[in-house]
Design a protein with these regions (language model features):
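Accessory nucleic acid-recognition modules appended to NTPase machines
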Residues: 1-110
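Active-site ExK catalytic segment of metal-dependent nucleases
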Residues: 110-121
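Short, hydrophobic beta-strand segments that form beta-sheet elements in well-ordered domains
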Residues: 114, 137-143
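Domain-level recognition of nuclease-like catalytic cores that cleave nucleotide substrates
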Residues: 146-174
């Protein structure tokens, strides 16, 4: 929050108030770091994502990550509202600089780690590191410009259509 406040030349308290207002208006949502059980984890700041991915300018990687964040957020809210699950979406960043974009937690258990790349299909080392240490049910690297999906070292490297395609096909799960 202090970095954002510094760039905007406002106080951190004002930045937090603005962010809270934007969240209440459904312009942005925040994803907080996972720190439970991770002694070297960074506990602040949250990542901020736009509900409307058209608001993301420039960096294709940031746009891809924001799009996946929106899809995961929608899926989490659907699971909570329609099926009664307690779902939380977090990210992981530690003091050594390792980061995984998303950690899907359902009923207080880590279910999936998700890393997003625009075109790099080489396995993300922090994803491997945390998949080995935290042992989620699934570890996924979503690559937007992926030529061919593959699995290696208990990690799936897939396209966004493969990850979210069933959600986009009405009637497929009936």
């Amino acid at each position: 929050m202090a970095n954002l406040a510094g760039e905007l030349e406002i106080s951190p308290i004002t930045a937090k108030r603005w962010l809270d207002l934007l969240e209440r208006m459904y312009v942005v949502f925040t994803v907080w770091p996972l720190s439970k059980g991770l002694p070297r984890a960074i506990r602040k700041p949250p990542k901020v994502y736009f509900y409307d991915t058209g608001d993301i300018l420039g960096d294709e990687g940031a746009r891809a990550e924001n799009l996946v964040a929106c899809e995961l957020k929608k899926l989490a809210e659907f699971r909570e509202d329609s099926e009664g699950y307690n779902v939380d979406l977090k990210y992981i960043r530690d003091k050594e600089g390792r980061e995984v974009d998303f950690a899907w937690i359902e009923e207080n258990k880590l279910q999936e780690l998700v890393e997003v790349k625009f075109s790099d299909d080489s396995l993300h080392k922090p994803l491997i590191y945390y998949a080995q240490r935290l042992n989620p049910n699934r570890a996924t690297q979503i690559v937007f410009n992926l030529k061919r999906s593959f699995s290696k070292a208990r990690l799936d490297v897939i396209s966004p259509i493969e990850r979210f395609g069933d959600l986009l096909a009405p009637g497929k799960n009936k």
